[in-house]
Structures are given as structure tokens and as C-alpha cells.
């Protein structure tokens, strides 16, 4: 498979290493320093663009790849208020797009457990959900996309709450 990488930081390097070890070809690795290469024939030849950049670049990265006919798998977070625009572009262009706040199998099992537990809590109004997350010092977005997904699923499943806040208490 021909893969373009959008965001060539820690995750981009890890994706490259794994992809190459499995016999895939990296046709482009786009970052802030070479953003114009997204217009290159090499980028357009990709079967998929794997996008792990940052909140300020993710939306444009996804849209630019889709406009060039390249399918996108994105794991960047803290920009998803613009997901509806990306989905509209996918529909208009007949493109392919997958986004998740976390691709870890273990975390996705945790997401499902979280949804089930939140639904069960509807029967117990004496309990209120609360969440606290701890990260390494280099974490760029906080709350993390994983925490935002968990909180959103709780809000969706619990009839007695209609939102969440980052404030403690």
C-alpha cells in the first residue's frame, strides 16, 4: 500500500517504521516544514493518508488530502468541532475518511464499557460521574481526545446530564 503521512512527529515516525516493516511504501511525509508537498504527484499517488498532526493543522490536512482524492485515516484531536465539514466534503467528493480519538483496541474496549456503565447509571441517580486524567508532560491537547470521547459518551447515555465541563467539582 502507498501511504502518505500527514504530521511527521512522534506518531508519524512510528507509523512510518511500522508501515515499512510490513512492506508498505511511504510516498510522502508532510509536516509544517514541507507542507507544499501535499500538492505533489507523490502525495496524490497515495492509497491513504494517515493524519496525526495537531489541532491547528488537522482540518486542513484532512480536507486537502480529500480534495486530492486520497483517503484519510485521522487520529488528531481537539479539532473535531469541524468534523461535519469534513464529512460534507467526503460526501461531495465520494471520498473515504475515518477518525477516532484513539485507535488502541484496549481503549476502544474501554469506550464500550464506559457507554454500558453510563447507561446502567441511569437507574442510580445518587451517583454522579466524574473523571480525572493524568498525562506525560509533553501531551499537547488536554483534555485528551480520549477523555472528550469518554465524557461525550457519558453525556449521551445519562438522561440526567446534558453536558460536561473541565472544571473540578
Regions found by a protein language model. Name each.
Residues 42-48, 52-76, 84-86:
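Rossmann-fold NAD(P) dinucleotide-binding segment
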Residues 63, 76-99, 105-119:
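Rossmann-fold NAD(P)-binding glycine/threonine-rich loop
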Residues 20, 66, 91:
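Anion (oxyanion) recognition and catalysis
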Residues 2, 10-43, 123-169:
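C-terminal substrate-binding/catalytic lobe of Rossmann-fold NAD(P)-dependent oxidoreductases
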Residues 26, 72-73, 96-97:
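Hydrophobic beta-strand scaffold residues
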Amino acid at each position: 500500500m502507498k501511504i502518505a503521512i500527514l504530521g511527521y512527529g512522534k506518531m508519524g515516525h512510528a507509523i512510518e517504521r511500522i508501515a515499512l516493516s510490513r512492506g508498505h511504501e511511504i510516498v510522502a511525509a508532510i509536516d509544517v516544514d514541507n507542507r507544499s508537498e501535499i500538492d505533489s504527484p507523490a502525495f496524490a499517488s497515495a492509497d491513504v493518508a494517515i493524519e496525526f498532526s495537531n489541532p491547528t493543522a488537522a482540518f486542513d490536512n484532512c480536507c486537502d488530502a480529500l480534495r486530492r482524492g486520497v483517503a484519510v485515516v485521522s487520529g488528531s484531536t481537539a479539532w473535531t468541532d469541524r468534523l461535519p465539514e469534513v464529512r460534507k466534503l467526503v460526501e461531495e467528493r465520494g471520498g473515504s475518511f475515518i477518525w477516532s480519538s484513539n485507535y488502541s483496541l484496549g481503549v476502544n474496549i474501554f469506550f464500550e464499557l464506559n457507554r454500558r456503565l453510563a447507561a446502567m447509571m441511569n437507574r442510580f441517580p445518587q451517583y454522579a460521574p466524574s473523571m480525572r486524567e493524568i498525562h506525560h508532560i509533553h501531551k499537547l491537547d488536554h483534555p485528551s481526545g480520549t477523555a472528550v470521547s469518554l465524557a461525550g459518551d457519558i453525556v449521551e447515555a445519562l438522561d440526567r446530564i446534558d453536558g460536561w465541563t473541565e472544571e473540578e467539582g
